[in-house]
C-alpha cells in the first residue's frame, strides 16, 4: 500500500492517513515509558486494553507504570533541575522550537491516532493534532517577551522556577494537554514528570517519540503512563515534586489538592464546568443557534467548556426550540472518519453508560425531550455513540442542569429578564466558561462582566491562546496559557540590599 502523497492530502483524501496507520500496526503493544531521556520497560506489569470507541474493538495494549516508576521519573527530573533551571531564555526558546518542529512532523500520525483511539470526528481530530504543536509555538512567544527580573521599589524581584513539576493530563485532548503543560513548565525552567491518561497511550507514544527527537537533556521531561491511584498519587504526594498541574474532574482535583497540601505544593487545577450560553432577546437565532449547538456538542460533548445550559428568553422559547430541532436534525453522529460527522463516540463504555443514565434522569425529573434521547443514533449498531440530545422545560435545580454530563446532552432553560438570566447562569458550583450572544455587542459585554466564569466568549467560539484560561469556584485554581500560565511555574524572590 503506497504512502500518502502531498497531492492526495491536498485533495482531502482522508482515508489515506488511516490506511498508513493500519499498515504500520493493527494491534499495538506499548510496553515502554520515558525516563531520564530513554525509553524503558516499566517496573509495573499491569496490562491495559486500548479500544477504538467507534467499533468497541481492542486496538492495542499498554503496560502501565507503577509507583516505583513514578519515583524513578521524579528522581530523574530532580537530578536534571539544577542544571536546566540555570539555562537562559534563548536556550529554552531553541528547545521549544525543536519540540514544535518535532511534534508538527508527527501531525498526520497523531491525527489518525486521535480518530482511532479517541473517536474524534475528522475536523476536531485535525484541530487537536495541530493544537499539540501550536501550543509549543505559543509558549515560545510568551517566553521571548517575558522578563524574569523586575524592580519593586528598591528591591530586585526575580521570577524563579519552582522545581520538579508533576503534570497530570486527561483523555479528551491528550496530546494538546501534554504539550501545553510541558511547554509552560520548561519555559519557566522547571523539569517535569507527566502522567497521561492510560486510555490515550497510542497518542502518548507518538508525542513522546516526537519530544525525544527534539533532543532535550536527559531527565528534563519524563512520561509515565499509569493509573491515577498509583502513579498519580505518587506524583501528588512525593516531597520532591514542587508543582502540580492537573486537568480533569472536580472530584479528582479535590483529591489532588488535599494530597499536595501536606507538602504545600503549588497547584494549578483546571476542572469541570457547566457552562451557560446566554441568548439575549435581541439575538438573531439563524446566526446564534448553530453556534450554540457547536458550543454544546464540541468534542462530542466531552469538553469541560461545552455550553450545556442554554438560556433563552421565555417569550421566544417556541421559536428557539424549532430552530434547535432543525439544527440537531442535521447534526450527524456516527463514524468519526466521515467528514460530515459532528459528534463521535464516547471514549469508553463507562462514559457511554454515564451519559445514558443522565438522559434517563432528565426524563424522570420532568424535562421534555425535543431532540435525541436514549440509545444509539438510528442506523448505528456498534460503538459508544450517543444520540445528540436536547431537553427543554429544564429548571436549574434539575440534575441535568447542575451536574457535568460530559456528553452531547444540552438543556434549554428560560428567563424573564436579563437579571434573571445572569442569576441562573451564576447559580452553579462551576465557573469555567460562559457564552453570551446578542445583536448588541456592548450589551453582551455588560452581561459578560457580571458572569462568574474564567472566560466569557461574546458572539464567538474562537480561542485566544494568549489569554488566561481557568475557572472560578469549583472549576479550578490558577490559570493556564500566556503569561499567566508561565508564571504558574515560577516563584517570585525579592532581593534587597545595596549593590
Where are these regions (language model features)?
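Conserved C-terminal structural/oligomerization subdomain of aldehyde/semialdehyde dehydrogenase
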Residues: 55-61, 241, 278, 332, ...
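Structural signal for hydrophobic packing residues in well-ordered secondary-structure cores
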Residues: 81, 85, 100-107, 111, ...
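Residue-level signal for inorganic ion chemistry
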Residues: 56, 77, 92, 114, ...
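Rossmann-like NAD(P) dinucleotide-binding subdomain of oxidoreductase/dehydrogenase enzymes
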Residues: 148-287, 415
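Short, well-ordered beta-strand elements within core beta-sheets of diverse protein domains
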Residues: 59-65, 80-86, 166-167, 277-279, ...
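Short, often N-terminal, low-complexity regions
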Residues: 1-3, 8-11
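ALDH superfamily catalytic-core signature
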Residues: 251-394, 458
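N-terminal Rossmann-like NAD(P)+-binding subdomain of aldehyde/semialdehyde dehydrogenases
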Residues: 9, 16, 20-153, 347
Amino acid at each position: 500500500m503506497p504512502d500518502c502523497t502531498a497531492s492526495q492530502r491536498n485533495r482531502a483524501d482522508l482515508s489515506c492517513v488511516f490506511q498508513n496507520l493500519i499498515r504500520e500496526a493493527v494491534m499495538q503493544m506499548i510496553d515502554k515509558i520515558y525516563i531520564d531521556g530513554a525509553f524503558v520497560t516499566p517496573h509495573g506489569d499491569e496490562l491495559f486494553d486500548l479500544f477504538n470507541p467507534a467499533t468497541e474493538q481492542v486496538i492495542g495494549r499498554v503496560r502501565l507504570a507503577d509507583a516505583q516508576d513514578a519515583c524513578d521519573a521524579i528522581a530523574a527530573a530532580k537530578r536534571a533541575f539544577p542544571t536546566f533551571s540555570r539555562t537562559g531564555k534563548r536556550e529554552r526558546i531553541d528547545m521549544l522550537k525543536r519540540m514544535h518542529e518535532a511534534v508538527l512532523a508527527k501531525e498526520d500520525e497523531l491525527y489518525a491516532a486521535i480518530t482511532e483511539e479517541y473517536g474524534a470526528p475528522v475536523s476536531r481530530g485535525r484541530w487537536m493534532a495541530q493544537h499539540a504543536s501550536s501550543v509549543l509555538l505559543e509558549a515560545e512567544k510568551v517566553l521571548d517577551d517575558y522578563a524574569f527580573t523586575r524592580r519593586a521599589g528598591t528591591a530586585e524581584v526575580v521570577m524563579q522556577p519552582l522545581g520538579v513539576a508533576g503534570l497530570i493530563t486527561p483523555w479528551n485532548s491528550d496530546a494538546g494537554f501534554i504539550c501545553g503543560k510541558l511547554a509552560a513548565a520548561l519555559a519557566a525552567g522547571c523539569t517535569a514528570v507527566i502522567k497521561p491518561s492510560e486510555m490515550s497511550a497510542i497518542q502518548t507514544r507518538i508525542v513522546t517519540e516526537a519530544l525525544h527527537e527534539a533532543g532535550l537533556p536527559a531527565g528534563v521531561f519524563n512520561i509515565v503512563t499509569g493509573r491515577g491511584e498509583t502513579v498519580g498519587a505518587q506524583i501528588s504526594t512525593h516531597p520532591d515534586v514542587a508543582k502540580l498541574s492537573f486537568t480533569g474532574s472536580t472530584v479528582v482535583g479535590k483529591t489532588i489538592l488535599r494530597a499536595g497540601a501536606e507538602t504545600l505544593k503549588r497547584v494549578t487545577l483546571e476542572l469541570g464546568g457547566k457552562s451557560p450560553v446566554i441568548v439575549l432577546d435581541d439575538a438573531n437565532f439563524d446566526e446564534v443557534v448553530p453556534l450554540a449547538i457547536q458550543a454544546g456538542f464540541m468534542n462530542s460533548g466531552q469538553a469541560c467548556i461545552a455550553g450545556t445550559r442554554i438560556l433563552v428568553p421565555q417569550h421566544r422559547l417556541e421559536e428557539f426550540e424549532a430552530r434547535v430541532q432543525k439544527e440537531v436534525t442535521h447534526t450527524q453522529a456516527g463514524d468519526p472518519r466521515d467528514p460530515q460527522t459532528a459528534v463521535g463516540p464516547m471514549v469508553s463504555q463507562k462514559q457511554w453508560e454515564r451519559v445514558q443514565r443522565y438522559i434517563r434522569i432528565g426524563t424522570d425529573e420532568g424535562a421534555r425531550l425535543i431532540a435525541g434521547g436514549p440509545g444509539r443514533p438510528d442506523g448505528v449498531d456498534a460503538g459508544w455513540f450517543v444520540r445528540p440530545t436536547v431537553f427543554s422545560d429544564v429548571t436549574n435545580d434539575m440534575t441535568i442542569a447542575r451536574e457535568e454530563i460530559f456528553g452531547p446532552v444540552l438543556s434549554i432553560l428560560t428567563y424573564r429578564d436579563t437579571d434573571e438570566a445572569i442569576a441562573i447562569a451564576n447559580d452553579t458550583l462551576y465557573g469555567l466558561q460562559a457564552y453570551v450572544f446578542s445583536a448588541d455587542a456592548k450589551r453582551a459585554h455588560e452581561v459578560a462582566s457580571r458572569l462568574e466564569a474564567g472566560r466569557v466568549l461574546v458572539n464567538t467560539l474562537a480561542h485566544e491562546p494568549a489569554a488566561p484560561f481557568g475557572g472560578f469556584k469549583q472549576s479550578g485554581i490558577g490559570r493556564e496559557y500566556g503569561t499567566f500560565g508561565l508564571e504558574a511555574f515560577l516563584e517570585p524572590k525579592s532581593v534587597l540590599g545595596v549593590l
